[in-house]
Amino acid sequence: MKKILFLSVLISTLSCSNKKEVKHVAEISCGQCQFELDSETGCDLAVRIDSKAYFVDGFDIDAFGDAHDEHTGFCEVIRKAEIKGVLENGRFKASSVKLVDNLK
């Protein structure tokens, strides 16, 4: 019985800690202004993966220029980016964000 309990705990621990970093080309923009997310106040960076939007942790919305610039700002346009990270607790924990569109 102890062996079964030990194996159950071990398998559970391994499956929970196996969060693999994913790499996607996804839409990236302001969660509130463009993706209609409302669980944060102010403007925050978000990505849309498979038609679902997630707030981004690890990068600030102004890290890529003025968020309110009418041609390139995340509050004004939806852009494309190559993103790497982990989906965790309904948020995207980003380790890398590289814009891949040609907006300047």
Model feature map: region roles:
Residues 14-15:
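C-terminal motif of bacterial Sec signal peptides marking the signal peptidase cleavage site
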Residues 65-82:
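Short nucleic-acid-contacting surface segments enriched for D/E, G, S/T with interspersed K/R
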Residues 40-60:
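OB-fold (S1/OB) nucleic-acid-binding surfaces
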Residues 21-43:
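Structural detector for short beta-strands of small beta-barrel domains
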Residues 29-32, 57-64, 99-101:
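A short, sequence-level motif marking secondary-structure junctions
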Residues 88-104:
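OB-fold/S1-family single-stranded nucleic acid-binding modules
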Residues 1-4:
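Positively charged n-region of N-terminal signal peptides that target proteins for export
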